[in-house]
Design a protein with these regions (language model features):
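Acyl-donor (CoA/ACP) binding surface of acyl/acetyltransferases
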Residues: 1-104
Length: 104
């Protein structure tokens, strides 16, 4: 059976920070995930100190779910917390119906 959920991730070169590329690309991925793949949930996580990535999630109106304590191990071996956001298909269609992205 196909998966009902996916994880959204992105990397942007520092040369292009602040131009909104992560937000625009993520909107396209969310649209494809919910409208074409019929996903029920898309998750997005980042390190607590990554304020830019948290801001992308906020601009996309991802509901905040909390902190996954010691949720990730880096290549260096260091264990880090993860800030967790997730959007359901219900959230997405409400955003689309009410045109909330356009109002931001």
């Amino acid at each position: 059976t196909p998966s009902f959920k996916a994880e959204l991730g992105y990397t942007v070169s520092p040369y292009y920070w602040g131009y909104g590329y992560a937000v625009e690309a993520s909107k396209a991925v969310l649209k494809y995930g919910f409208e074409e793949l019929n996903l029920k949930r898309i998750e997005c996580m980042c390190f607590p100190e990554n304020s830019q990535s948290k801001r992308v999630c906020e601009k996309l109106l991802f509901p905040y779910e909390g902190v996954r304590r010691k949720g990730y191990q880096l290549y260096s071996g260091r264990i880090s917390d993860l800030v967790s956001f997730a959007m359901t298909d219900d959230d997405y269609y409400k955003i689309k119906e009410e045109q909330l992205w356009e109002k931001k």
